[in-house]
């Protein structure tokens, strides 16, 4: 009635059902309960169990304890206990109609690590790149025909106190709990298999993830999720060591719907970039460094939507140094760029600020940082189309306000169709392009119009444009101009003077020259007091800069003190040469009155002296020379005035020639005409 077998070995082969097994170290006890029921107890070493040419068990110690029922066309095991190594389950097995079977199994409080250890070898690739631990309970059914390759599988499970990590990445989830189902689908294979996750809850070190998901096609995992998250960005610093974002801090929360392939190896990034992703997010009190930026970027708050590779920023408040910026718009292909899937990303939208401090964007504690890092190469990884609206911009002494217009960046080039701004007490409109050439130099080409700029403020702000010939303290007035400019800098942002070209139309209104030494050199003709402060209403000219020379075509200055025509050039090495024509009707009258006190009282009001004195003013920043080119005098004097001509000649001789001893008398050509 009872049977006991010790230390036996059993080898079984059935080519029809394609079942093969080899059992060693068998200790078997069979107790008969009735004619068709037995109690089977056994423990053994299963060397192998193969089914349909697949290795299900290899070298595992197995303990079995349960009832066996043997009936015609039906064999069953009801609520038996089986333990494979440290994995314990209850199961029931029913064979019927000779070829069909149903296997029900159930486990409670089992270690997931034991399931992994006892997973058939042909399935272990599932776990190659992941680490899973924790508790699981399950109940399932395997149903099929013995002679068919794959039976159907359906499992209900729940997980608690579990963890999940990646072998090649520090990404880690802990305290995982969820429940769901596992099924191999209609075709009973990996391709139609699915795993559902319901009420999924997990924690990171400083965050949480909750939601649900489904994994389908275990040959090539497809993941669909609907999750809510609240995460610390500190943890992301370790996920991608090659990311241009580093030293991240702050929090991000939102929801995410993911649909696409997923893998836990090197193909993870590719799958991520090609998935359908939709996420609404909020960022608060976040900071990070980005590439070679000089300072940390602070995001006070931001709200947006991620739609696959497009990030729509609904609103954001960003702080960089002392500058607070508001941005809304789209960022496309940022994630593919971060993960080296695409060479660049594109930003478009609206940027506004109450005040921008330019120095914060180009300097840090290292004085050479700007030259050594930021200027050697303009970035080629970003493209931008931005509408700007900046209330104030500060850079050194430069104060700009009400900046608006479009700013574009592509292929290492900034460009704009139109930007408006206010500066130096006036308004400016500009268009142009600033770019990095193939020679690694930097070039600008701009068409600029400005109206009513304050001359003193302009010269003061730009530190007299690096020259000392004429300075802010010498100038007052309003200047308007339209000019075209081409300029180049080397890769440390030093101007290349020989490549500077400028063509302009300018007009100065309400102009004043104050204590301008070169003009005071004309004191032989005009009172020194008059020359110290010259006022004129309007001055117009076309200025050209080319070949390191500023060319000044003839322009007329009219004032109460002096009227003159000036033309010439001023080189970048501070050498200059100007032609000056003086209209001496008033000049000589002033001198004449000093010598002849009765002239003013006796002269007729219609009498005029018209004399043209042509001078050359040349020199450099260290010296100034003035010489005569030609002196012409015209007269139209009524009868009796010729006598006064001799007095005028005497004045010139005494007051001009004697003071300019280096001038040769023969160079003064006096041309007199009897008629006007």
Cite the ranges covered by each PLM segment.
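Membrane-proximal interfacial segments on either side of biological membranes
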Residues: 2-51, 70, 75, 87-200, ...
């Amino acid at each position: 009635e009872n049977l006991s077998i010790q230390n036996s070995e059993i080898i079984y082969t059935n080519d029809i059902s394609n079942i093969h097994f080899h059992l060693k170290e068998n200790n078997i006890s069979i107790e008969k309960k009735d004619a068709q029921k037995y109690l089977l107890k056994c423990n053994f070493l299963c060397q192998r169990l193969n089914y349909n040419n697949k290795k299900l068990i290899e070298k595992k110690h197995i303990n079995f304890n349960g009832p066996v029922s043997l009936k015609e066309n039906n064999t069953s095991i009801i609520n038996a206990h089986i333990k494979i190594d440290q994995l314990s389950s209850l199961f029931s097995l029913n064979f019927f109609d000779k070829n069909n079977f149903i296997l029900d199994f159930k486990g409670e409080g089992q270690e997931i690590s034991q399931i992994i250890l006892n997973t058939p070898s042909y399935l272990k690739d599932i776990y190659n790149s992941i680490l899973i631990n924790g508790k699981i309970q399950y109940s399932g059914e395997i149903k099929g025909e013995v002679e068919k390759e794959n039976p159907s599988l359906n499992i209900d499970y729940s997980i608690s106190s579990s963890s999940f990590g990646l072998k090649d990445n520090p990404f880690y989830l802990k305290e995982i709990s969820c429940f769901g189902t596992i099924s191999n689908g209609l075709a009973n294979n990996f391709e139609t298999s699915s795993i559902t996750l319901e009420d999924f809850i997990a924690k990171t070190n400083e965050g949480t993830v909750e939601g649900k998901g489904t994994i389908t096609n275990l040959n090539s995992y497809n993941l669909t999720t609907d999750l809510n998250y609240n995460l610390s960005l500190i943890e992301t610093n370790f996920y991608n060591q090659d990311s241009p974002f580093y030293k991240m801090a702050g929090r991000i929360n939102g929801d995410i719907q993911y649909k696409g392939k997923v893998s836990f190896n090197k193909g993870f990034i590719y799958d991520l970039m090609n998935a359908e992703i939709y996420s609404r997010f909020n960022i608060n009190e976040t900071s990070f460094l980005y590439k070679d930026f000089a300072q940390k970027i602070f995001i006070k708050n931001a709200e947006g939507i991620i739609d696959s590779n497009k990030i729509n920023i609904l609103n954001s408040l960003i702080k960089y140094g002392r500058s607070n910026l508001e941005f809304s718009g789209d960022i496309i292909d940022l994630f593919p760029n971060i993960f080296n899937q695409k060479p660049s990303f594109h930003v478009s939208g609206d940027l506004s600020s109450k005040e921008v401090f330019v120095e914060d964007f180009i300097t840090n504690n290292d004085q050479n940082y700007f030259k050594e890092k930021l200027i050697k190469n303009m970035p080629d990884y970003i493209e931008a189309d931005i509408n700007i609206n900046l209330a104030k911009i500060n850079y050194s002494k430069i104060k700009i306000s009400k900046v608006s217009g479009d700013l574009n960046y592509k292929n290492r080039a900034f460009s704009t169709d139109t930007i408006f701004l206010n500066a130096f007490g006036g308004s400016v409109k500009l268009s142009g392009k600033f770019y990095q050439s193939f020679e690694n130099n930097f070039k600008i080409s701009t068409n600029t119009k400005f109206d009513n700029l304050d001359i003193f403020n302009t010269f003061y702000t730009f530190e007299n444009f690096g020259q000392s010939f004429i300075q802010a303290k010498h100038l007052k007035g309003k200047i308007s101009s339209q000019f075209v400019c081409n300029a180049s800098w080397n890769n440390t942002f030093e101007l290349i003077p020989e490549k500077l070209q400028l063509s302009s139309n300018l007009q100065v209104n309400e102009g004043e020259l104050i204590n301008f030494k070169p003009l005071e050199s004309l004191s032989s003709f005009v009172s020194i007091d008059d020359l110290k402060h010259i006022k004129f209403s309007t001055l117009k000219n076309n200025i050209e800069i080319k070949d390191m020379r500023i060319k000044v075509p003839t322009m007329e200055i009219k004032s109460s003190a002096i009227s003159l025509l000036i033309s010439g050039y001023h080189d970048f090495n501070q050498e200059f040469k100007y032609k000056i024509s003086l209209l001496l009707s008033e000049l000589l009258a002033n001198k004449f009155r000093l010598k002849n006190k009765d002239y003013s009282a006796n002269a007729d009001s219609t009498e005029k002296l018209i004399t043209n004195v042509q001078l050359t003013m040349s020199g450099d920043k260290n010296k100034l020379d003035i010489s005569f080119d030609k002196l012409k005098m015209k007269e139209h004097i009524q009868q009796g005035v010729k006598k006064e001509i001799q007095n005028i000649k005497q004045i010139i001789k005494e007051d001009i020639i004697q003071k300019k001893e280096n001038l040769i008398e023969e160079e003064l050509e006096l041309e007199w005409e009897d008629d006007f």
